[in-house]
């Protein structure tokens, strides 16, 4: 599916703010903590040699490449992401059992029913404004008894970067350009996740809240992470000159959080494994 064929879901973040710079930043930044959390999620999911696995919201393909090694030559991994620039980077990771396509979680039309043993979504679910359609699509492409693994932001646990950014954006002159709802995330809590599983054909085998620690070496690194991981939506609603000012203000306020080890955020992450009924 080409990028021009993607269907925008009401309230979803913009896909037009990504850039080569942000995509390469994301490749570099996600190679540490986010990739490691994805590796742990693959363990929770119990990925086995010979299985067919869908990495939904695969980004630049680091986790998909790792899973391709886990499933081995008799298995298969397909990575799907709505951002063409990130899929372009992902396709540089060449494996005979690994492929990537531009597409979105709401419309997996290119994938056949009951064609996967497992689906993994790492750091993706909180971007969906409407949750049931992606879960129903996952249920459709999974075989009966197939597993879905989700690692996502826990509701009510925003990073310090986003807390400070929200305060800055509520002040003049930035408040003249309110951030669209589509440029915010849509996290859930454990009970909401359980309910979503139940209504979309999954039995929960694991729903767990885990402690999570993030560290950024500098205020600039924290801002760049937020921009890259949000594919430009972090401050993308501001005119260019105000975006520069907002970045400078956020950077200045983040400086007060610096320790000898950098800016440290202790948060919580929601991990869920569902089995298709």
Set out the residue ranges of the language-model regions.
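Conserved class I S-adenosyl-L-methionine
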Residues: 2-51, 62-66, 86-89, 93, 149-175
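Conserved Class I S-adenosyl-L-methionine
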Residues: 7, 11, 15, 60-62, ...
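A structural alpha-helix within SAM-dependent methyltransferase catalytic domains
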Residues: 42, 65-68, 135-139, 166
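Class I SAM-dependent methyltransferase SAM/SAH-binding core
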Residues: 54-56, 60-108, 133
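A short acidic, Gly/Pro-enriched loop at the edge of an enzyme's catalytic core
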Residues: 106, 110-119
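A short glycine-rich, Lys/Arg-flanked "PGG" loop and its adjoining helix->strand segment in the class I
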Residues: 132-147
